[in-house]
Swiss-Prot record:
Entry-linked SUPFAM superfamilies: TolB, N-terminal domain, Tricorn protease N-terminal domain
Signal sequence, start to end: 1-19
Database matches in NCBIfam families: propeller_TolB
Stated name of the protein: Tol-Pal system protein TolB
Keywords: Cell cycle, Cell division, Periplasm, Signal
Amino acid sequence: MRNIIYFILSLLFSVTSYALETINIEHGRADPTPIAVNKFDADNSAADVLGHDMVKVISNDLKLSGLFRPISAASFIEEKTGIEYKPLFAAWRQINASLLVNGEVKKLESGKFKVSFILWDTLLEKQLAGEMLEVPKNLWRRAAHKIADKIYEKITGDAGYFDTKIVYVSESSSLPKIKRIALMDYDGANNKYLTNGKSLVLTPRFARSADKIFYVSYATKRRVLVYEKDLKTGKESVVGDFPGISFAPRFSPDGRKAVMSIAKNGSTHIYEIDLATKRLHKLTDGFGINTSPSYSPDGKKIVYNSDRNGVPQLYIMNSDGSDVQRISFGGGSYAAPSWSPRGDYIAFTKITKGDGGKTFNIGIMKACPQDDENSEKIITSGYLVESPCWSPNGRVIMFAKGWPSSAKAPGKNKIFAIDLTGHNEREIMTPADASDPEWSGVLN
């Protein structure tokens, strides 16, 4: 992964195409870069309100990444705003702002808003990026996320991940427990429920286009259905009735196929389904439990976990089921592997036992089983941490985290995100308990 953001703080401050080819996972932490997101200029009161809200979202996006430190507007010296003037760079350097964002919002006759921004390097006194967006009022948050994505990409060299969605399972705290599929922005905003809570639902997954989701619903104890829901129209249809399915399918990069695990005759195996013909093809053989399949970004490989050797471990096979190779060799049980969109790492859940009982861990390992450096790295641990999934740029991992009940408080489950390096762990706020997160690709 490119590492240009860590070079910004060097003595010869520079935001250019210079970049390291890979990030050092063991030593990936750096001080966040100070950035000033200035008040957006506006041509009327409606545009002013919109600009104010957008500045807050942009600043929050950059702060949540852990790579930027937005400077409080209370310390700003220069009073000019907008994109029509060249900043007084000395005034921004005086408050230690390495980067400056200026912008403006104008309301158009169509009712839409034209949003423009410029990213400045205050030390080199040069423009680094700029763009104009035309957006309807109801999509102002997406416009703010897109601006933050542009800033993130210009400084880090990696694509941003702010204009994305999270689908997850929401669970009420009161009895009886009600589980519903919910959808929200990556930062927890715009939460809405997609199912009514009348049946048990599990493991929502995005289709490759991110405008559809699939999830498992237990219509009855014996009948398990996989549903497809169109997020644009709200229409829902049954993909299939799969007795013994344990998780919703994961989709191939081309969107034509999906893999799932199904229990039959005492064993659980990996199956691939052709979404056009609905034809199933069994990929694993023998006895045991084979679950949680996930495609590689190029669709040529599948990672999954299996207890074929007594303890659940991680395996990789070709997408046709051939050339099976074990890739995990540490102590403990492995589960829920998820292949990074970059193709370099696989995230997983690992359960270890000690004197204090079980400990759940989220870790990453190199995806190449022949790599001598295929050592795993645990990035977070807890009473219950599970279901890792990746940001579209492979920089951040989102997961579910749980706490046990105590005399002072009931148990709870929430969604957290953490940097690939194991730093910057933070909670994604949800209205109720939450589990089984799935991260969309960047929205169109």
